[in-house]
Structure formats: C-alpha cells, structure tokens
Amino acid sequence: MKPFSPEVSPDPCPATAAHLLRTYTLFLTLLELAQGCRGSMVSNRPFITVWNADTHWCLKDHGVDVDVSVFDVVANKEQNFQGPNMTIFYREELGTYPYYTPTGEPVFGGLPQNASLVTHLAHAFQDIKAAMPEPDFSGLAVIDWEAWRPRWAFNWDSKDIYQQRSMELVRAEHPDWPETLVEAEAQGQFQEAAEAWMAGTLQLGQVLRPRGLWGYYGFPDCYNYDFLSPNYTGQCSLSIHDQNDQLGWLWNQSYALYPSIYLPAALMGTGKSQMYVRYRVQEAFRLALVSRDPHVPIMPYVQIFYEKTDYLLPLEELEHSLGESAAQGAAGAVLWISSEKTSTKESCQAIKAYMDSTLGPFILNVTSAALLCSEALCSGRGRCVRHPSYPEALLTLSPASFSIEPTHDGRPLSLKGTLSLKDRAQMAMKFKCRCYRGWSGEWCKKQDM
C-alpha cells in the first residue's frame, strides 16, 4: 500500500503525459485489431449477477456461511473485492488519484490539473498487475472514483471545492482577470485534466488486461433525485442528457458501463423506485447506442439494502431494481454490500436468511427466465428486451409452469418446470430481441459477415 501523501511529483516533461496516452491508445487499437471481439464473462449470456461483497468475513469472524455459490451468482474465491471474476479499485488502490479530504486538505495535488498524470500511471501500472496477476483476466474491472466528477457542472455540494480550488489556481496566475473569464478558464482546465486522468487510466488498464470489462462505477448518472416532487417521473432532465452527451470520450473508452441503481432510503414506501431505476438504466443504453461500441455491456450496481440503512429490500423492490435491469436487456447486475454489513454476527445472519429466502430464489427466477426467453425468442443469440408497449413487463417465470424448491442437503436451489405455449406467447408479445455481437434479424438468426 502506498503511503498517504499529498505530495505531487512534477512531470519530467509537460508533453510526456500526452505522449504516454497516445502510445497507450495506439497499443489498444492494435490489440483490438488483433483480437477482434473481446471475450468476457458476460459474452453471449443473457443475464448474470455478480457478487461484489466480502461476506467471507461472516464465516471467518462469526461462523455464518453466506453461501452465494448455491445461486446463479458469479463470486470471487473467498467473496472479496478482488479476484479473477471481479476486481474493483478504490481510490487508494489505483495510482495517485488526486482529491481533497473532508477537511479540505489536498491529496496528491487535490485537483487533476494540479497533479502528475505520469506519476499516477506509473503507480497504476504496478497496482493493476498486482491486483490482476493473470494477463488474460476477463472479469469485471471497475474503478470507483467518487471524489470529483469529470463535468464541471456536476461538482455541486461537497464537490464544489473542486470548482473553487480550480478558480483559485487561475486567479493566482491571472489576478487581473474578471470572474467570468476566471471561471471559464478554470472549467476548461479542470475538464481537460479530468478527461486525461479518467481516459488515460482506462486505456492503461485495457492495454495491460485487454479482456477485462473496464469502466467506472456510477457512470452514467441520471441525477433523478427529486423524489418529493408530486409530478416525479424519474426521467433524466434535458440538461443532464446534454452534459452526459459531452462525455462521449468516456462512453467510447469504456468496455462496460456501471450505473448505480442503489435505492435511497427516501424511496421507501413511495412507489417510485421503478421509475427511478428505469431511467437510470435507460440513460446507460441511450449513451451506449451512440458510442463506439453499441454492444458495450450494461451492468448496473445494486444494493440489497436501502442505501445507508439496515433495511433489506422487499421482493417488489428487487423486481424494481434487478428485475427492471433484466427487462431492459442489461448484461447483468453487480450486487454490492458494504463491509460494515459483514462486521456483526446479527447482520451476517440477516444477510444469510435474506439470501436463502428472498434474493437467491429471485436471482434463479430472473436468470432462468432470461435464458429461456433468449432461447425461445432469440435463438440463444441475443437478450430479450421489454417491448415499449408493455412498460411493466418483467422477465420472470410463471408460477403456473415453474417452481423453485430448496434442497436440504446443501445443494443449490432446484428449478422445475418447462415453458408452456402460453408462456412462449406471452414472451413473444411483451419482449423483443437485442442480438449479441455478430448476429442480427428479428430472431437473431442471421450471422453478420
């Protein structure tokens, strides 16, 4: 682990960072040409759920075995935050990410335009190789940088310090400039540097581990938090659409998009969760369709608790989060639990009971429905996507045709049943196909040349 230090190592040459990024981009392009379609853990699979939690501590510290392997959940060995299927980098674990502490102290320069990108990439090079020792890593590679956002306009409330300190830098250099010019220059400097840092880090990861699904947690965002509005629809505002459109470089560079659909506590009992989630996931698809790769996997981040509470989501809220994501044709979802939730025996027992009674059966239901729909409608070569005429339709199995039964000998839950003609007709009416890369046509039967 690197020592905590606010010091910044000056770049050896002002042009080095730009040259380094151009070199990485060239390497990445050559790799893509050589490999063609990147294979990954989500390739040609309708819907997967990834367990991104360190619940192994429940067994190690409290004797509570949260056995997620019995479900259709891809979990790392020992269920920790880094492994062959899933690696997440927090700010202390990848390079020398610049930010301000809650007391306003700069770390590694504080601002991206006041920090050394070359030093960061050199450290990140070693961090990536250490966290992902296998060159053919093909799992999810998530960067969790939340201190600042790459668009100036998105840095409000506690993030306003990045605007204020950016303007201070410009004032110090140009004390005679009017405030309008100071802010315009500060905005330009900040956004240019933010792009260099975020794009450069992605490019480095993609060069070192080209099969990994590299992307940033929480991007894109819809900022649709006005739950108390009596006319709340959940839709992203036009101004948010415009700002997200300016981040084309980020969507073009990402190998996966990881929007957050954590449910804030304010949504409890409001009946607005599905609207909230729907437009956050839709925004990811909107941006993916105009990016360099319209097939980029969408993998929303889901919590099983209401955010910052100890209240587990009821089944209907799982339908509004996991279920909504699957119905829109997401490649899967990442289930995350904070380490605080695994720190007590009581919390671990609650998680285990929830997994056994609610979450596990629901995951098996949704993933099985997605697979059966893919085979029935899309020739097994695409994902079922909800038809706009049926905005409430979910990919779940009919209880008249299927049953999910627990076993008593430690083996996984069992699914029994077959699709009836009525089930197939309902799927065909409410869903259509989004074909995997290389396939097209209404039923994904045509192989692209």
From Swiss-Prot:
Q: Which GO terms describe its biological process?
A: carbohydrate metabolic process; cartilage development; cellular response to fibroblast growth factor stimulus; cellular response to interleukin-1; cellular response to pH; cellular response to platelet-derived growth factor stimulus; cellular response to tumor necrosis factor; cellular response to UV-B
State the Gene3D superfamilies in the record: Aldolase class I
> PROSITE patterns in the record, alphabetically?
EGF_1 (PS00022), EGF_2 (PS01186)
Q: Name one GO cellular component term.
A: lysosome
Q: Name one Pfam family in it.
A: Glyco_hydro_56
EC id: 3.2.1.35
Main localization of the protein? Answer: secreted
Q: Where is the EGF-like domain?
A: 433-444
Q: Which EC class, in a word?
A: hydrolase
Tell me which UniProt keywords the record has, alphabetically: Disulfide bond, EGF-like domain, Glycoprotein, Glycosidase, Hydrolase, Lysosome, Secreted, Signal
InterPro entries hit by this protein: Aldolase_TIM, Glycoside_hydrolase_SF, Hyaluronidase
SUPFAM superfamilies, per the entry: (Trans)glycosidases
Q: Which compartments is it annotated to reside in? A: Secreted; Lysosome
Which Gene Ontology molecular-function terms are recorded? chondroitin hydrolase activity; hyalurononglucosaminidase activity
Cystine pairs: C58-C348, C222-C236, C373-C384, C378-C433, C435-C444
Glycosylation sites recorded in the entry for this protein: N85, N114, N231, N252, N365
Q: Where is the active site?
A: E146
Signal peptide stretch: 1-39
Q: Which residues cross the membrane?
A: none
Record's catalysed reaction(s): Random hydrolysis of (1->4)-linkages between N-acetyl-beta-D-glucosamine and D-glucuronate residues in hyaluronate
Role description: May have a role in promoting tumor progression. May block the TGFB1-enhanced cell growth. Overexpression of HYAL1 suppressed the growth rate of colon carcinoma cell tumors in an experimental model.
Which family does the entry's similarity section mention?
A: Belongs to the glycosyl hydrolase 56 family.
Protein name stated in the entry: Hyaluronidase-1
Q: State the organism of origin.
A: Rattus norvegicus
